[in-house]
Amino acid sequence: MKTLNLDLQEKSYPIYIGQDLLSEGKLLTKHISGKQVMIVTNTTVAPLYLEKVQNLLLSFEFAQVILPDGEKYKTLDTLNCIFNALLKNRFDRSCTLIALGGGVVGDMTGFAAASYQRGVNFIQIPTTLLSQVDSSVGGKTGINHVLGKNMIGIFHQPKCVLIDIDTLDTLNNQQYSAGMAEVIKYGLLGHLNFFNFLQENIRDLMDRNKPLMAEIIYQSCQYKINIVVQDELEVGKRALLNLGHTFGHVIENILGYGIFLHGEAISVGMLMAVKLSHLEGYLSINQVAQVQDLLEKANLPIFIIGKISASDFMKVMLVDKKVINGNIRLILLKELGHAFVCNHYKDQLLNQVINEFCQ
């Protein structure tokens, strides 16, 4: 097992990465201060891991909420299912919530924990590659709105993140590839050696080589930690982690959640950002080809599956957390491994990229 620490002073917490961690009772229970525990999971994960986690909590008063699975359920109505269970079971402010599942479960559990009685503790047990390398780390929580993704939420840090790599054994290939999109993102952001490592090992990674999987999860979490400790509330450098997300969120919003998995939409969004970086004169056409090749080898989409008009794309793009004073801030690349927040880009080049992908 490897341990990383996210140092946020009084809000600091460990990130445990290893195999068979769901059998390590003390690893989990030492981060539970009260007597009441609510496990939040979904219909896919519950049959696989709920009982295993429950067996670690026999000395606690515990209950569970089993939510429907899917991004389309990341709503206020589903969030109320968690609040209803907490109130029905008379959970007090000393309780701890445990998020057992992927990014949707983690985001909603964190938001519920931040809101219930003005804030209670929670723990992340991510079970998808995407949530292990990205959404479980850093304290972002929230739900979607019909007009925009993740537009309602709050920052609320967990007490710990417990990443059991063995949970990926039950992850289907599409979900695994979707997680690889976020891993590739870290290679593009500021870790060129990591990008090269991914290029060299992508076939073994897609075959789920356990030591390599452990390495990419560790490196991804380490990179995100380095960003979050500098900018917890995303007022500056943390915005870099949104590479591909402005474009990707538009795709998810217009097509409807479920057509593309989040990671699949981010794959297309990253390629759009890379192509705009090329048109702006930063990247060579060969570098664009390298990125596209890596995405394809990870079995990720490189074009939009579905019909979206360019005008609708731009309209929805303006409803984004990264829009300030009506200006869309984009994350572009000066080089592979060197991202930056771009406020001044040529509108005609942005339109050119959008038109290319919306045909």
UniProtKB/Swiss-Prot annotation:
Its EC number is 4.2.3.4. Pathway: Metabolic intermediate biosynthesis; chorismate biosynthesis; chorismate from D-erythrose 4-phosphate and phosphoenolpyruvate: step 2/7. It is an enzyme of class 4 (lyase). GO terms for cellular component: cytoplasm. Zn(2+) binds at residues 182, 245, 262. Belongs to the sugar phosphate cyclases superfamily. Dehydroquinate synthase family. This is 3-dehydroquinate synthase. It comes from Ruthia magnifica subsp. Calyptogena magnifica. The lineage of its organism: Bacteria, Pseudomonadati, Pseudomonadota, Gammaproteobacteria, Candidatus Pseudothioglobaceae.
